[in-house]
């Protein structure tokens, strides 16, 4: 197995992901939201690029859907939930379909459709993502959502931790960028302290979303790996 990293949704190229397993990472906060929602009984998640798409789906069956997401880290007017994973409790999402649109995460997911498999990853399920990627036995590309097309420290160190989880189990080849992410994690295992330097972290902190930051920086608290297949994110727990 070989592991590579793409540093933002804007840098995804078909030839880099074709026939490979992609792990999409937007730990602050879209992939953390998706993982949490499904873990709390959400039936499935539909990621879309625009607010208009989300509203169109929602109006087809208002009882079935919950709308979530953000623009510039803020809740979208008229949506049920923001991009805070802590809002997606069992009471809110159980047996519902979540329609989500975010600035970076949903773009990274939709941009990865040429991959063989698309796994949804974050710190909160990193070790389980490592297990799933090993079982799939393909080369792996970790797609960092980034922030508005730019590199994000938070996604990068999360990728480093995922690589750390993999290399504890099997031997892998790493590209230079993947090796760099691993090195950064190994030098900074206290992730929440390290990412205080990140611009995206500072933006979320400015909004006083301290609990979100603490939650998203917890390692391996969820044991599922949602997968994006044919426009829908689900988790078949029987395969793990």
Swiss-Prot record:
Pfam annotation, one family: 2-ph_phosp
Keyword terms of this UniProt record: Hydrolase, Magnesium
GO molecular function, one term: magnesium ion binding
This enzyme's EC code(s): 3.1.3.71
Known cofactor(s): Mg(2+)
Reaction catalysis annotation: (2R)-O-phospho-3-sulfolactate + H2O = (2R)-3-sulfolactate + phosphate
Transmembrane listed as a keyword: no
Gene3D superfamilies according to UniProt: ComB-like
HAMAP family in the record: ComB (MF_00490)
Name of the protein described by the UniProt record: Probable 2-phosphosulfolactate phosphatase
């Amino acid at each position: 197995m070989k592991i590579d990293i793409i540093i933002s949704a804007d840098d995804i190229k078909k030839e880099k992901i074709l026939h490979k397993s992609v792990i999409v990472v937007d730990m602050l906060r879209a992939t953390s939201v998706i993982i949490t929602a499904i873990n709390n009984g959400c039936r499935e998640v539909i990621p879309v690029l625009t607010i208009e798409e989300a509203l169109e789906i929602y109006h087809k069956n208002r009882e079935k859907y919950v709308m979530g997401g953000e623009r510039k880290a803020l809740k979208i007017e008229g949506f049920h939930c923001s991009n805070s994973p802590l809002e997606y409790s069992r009471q809110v999402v159980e047996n519902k379909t979540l329609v989500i649109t975010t600035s970076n995460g949903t773009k990274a997911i939709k941009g990865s459709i040429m991959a063989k498999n698309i796994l949804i990853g974050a710190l909160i399920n990193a070790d389980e993502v490592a297990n799933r990627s090993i079982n799939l036995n393909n080369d792996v590309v970790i797609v960092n959502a980034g922030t508005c097309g730019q590199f994000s420290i938070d996604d990068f160190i999360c990728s480093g931790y995922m690589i750390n989880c993999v290399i504890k189990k099997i031997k892998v080849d790493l590209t230079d960028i993947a090796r760099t992410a691993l090195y950064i994690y190994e030098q900074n295992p206290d992730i929440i302290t390290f990412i205080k330097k990140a611009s995206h972290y500072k933006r979320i902190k400015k909004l006083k979303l301290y609990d979100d930051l603490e939650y998203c920086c917890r390692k391996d608290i969820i044991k599922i790996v949602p997968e994006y297949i044919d426009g829908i994110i689900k988790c078949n727990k029987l395969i793990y």
